[in-house]
A protein has these predicted regions:
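Amphipathic alpha-helical polymerization modules
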Residues: 1-167, 171-176, 181-304
């Protein structure tokens, strides 16, 4: 009887975790570049039940069968499907469009490929590279940038956007002190490079290097850890997962004057949330049933 109680309780915890994930998805429908989460559940290992027969000196096990002891919410995976683009005409709004292919691998609609051996391979994803207040690199698809008091391109959280030289992008280029260029008036090309708005020529920094955004390719995006508002980080041991994209091709491009909308489907999210709530209520009723059964066993069976 207790096994059934534990199974129902585990189901309640799993559905609560799923409900929390869906609620977070719905709350971020209007967050640019947000990628919806998916609570992955898996069953506990099966138990082989047997009954011992015979004397204490020579017990013989008679198999009854297998029983599953419930499910658990194992992890929360992000679904990195490309979001729709929304035009804003704001020059500091940038959207990443990526469809990175890996030779010899055909990803499914969710960006996943399962090898014949059962190994899961996920489609690499492209991200803007930003620097937090502690100088640590972070990754984001939220391209709704602004300019801070120091003339730097920053995220809504105040994180500085990095260029390919690994330094924050400053919107005033003083390569020629006699004729400084205001990068706020520049255009940003599909490869993330800053171009002169008049002649379309690349703009260079004080060292003569072309000014371009640092776009990183994360080989396994499911190694990323959410920090909120579409910002992710990698653990130190996973730092090698992120590599700069120095020569962008048609698989990755930057669109100026657009933002990438969240890829959350509000209709499907409401359906999933309702289903999770119903499953939670069902497990709750089973817990109440087992509770009443045990109460009867304790208080009434002994009277017989």
């Amino acid at each position: 009887m207790l096994r059934g109680l534990y199974t129902a309780a585990a189901g309640m915890i799993s559905q609560q975790r799923k409900h929390d994930t869906i609620t977070n998805n719905i709350a971020n429908i209007n967050t640019p570049g947000f990628k919806q989460g998916n609570a992955v559940s898996r069953s506990f290992p099966e138990m082989l039940l047997a009954i011992s027969t015979g004397g204490s000196d020579s017990p013989v096990a008679s198999a009854i069968g297998r029983i599953n002891t419930g499910v658990m919410a194992e992890e929360d995976l992000s679904i990195y499907l490309q979001g729709d683009l929304q035009e804003t005409k704001n020059p500091f709004d940038l959207a990443l469009v990526s469809n990175i292919q890996v030779p010899g691998i055909a990803f499914d609609g969710a960006g996943k490929y399962i090898t014949p051996e059962g190994e899961r391979i996920y489609r690499p994803q492209a991200f803007f590279t930003v620097q937090d207040v502690n100088g640590e690199n972070r990754f984001s698809r939220n391209g709704r940038f602004t300019v801070n008091a120091g003339g730097e391109l920053v995220t809504p959280e105040g994180y500085r956007v990095l260029g390919q030289d690994g330094q924050p992008v400053v919107l005033v280029d003083n390569a020629d002190p006699a004729n400084p260029v205001l990068l706020a008036d520049a255009t940003i090309g599909p490869q993330g490079q800053f171009l002169d708005a008049v002649n379309g020529q690349p703009l260079n920094d004080v060292n003569g290097n072309q000014i371009s955004l640092l776009i990183s390719r994360v080989e396994n995006p499911n190694r990323l850890i959410r920090e909120g508002n579409g910002v992710y980080r990698l653990n130190e041991e996973d730092a090698a997962q992120a590599v700069p994209i120095l020569n962008m091709n048609d698989q990755v491009r930057v669109e100026q004057g657009y933002i990438e909308r969240s890829n959350v489907d509000p209709t499907q999210s409401m359906i999933d949330m309702t289903a999770a709530l119903r499953a939670y209520e069902t497990n709750q009723k089973m817990v109440q049933f087992y509770d009443k059964s045990m109460e009867k066993a304790v208080n009434e069976v002994g009277r017989v």
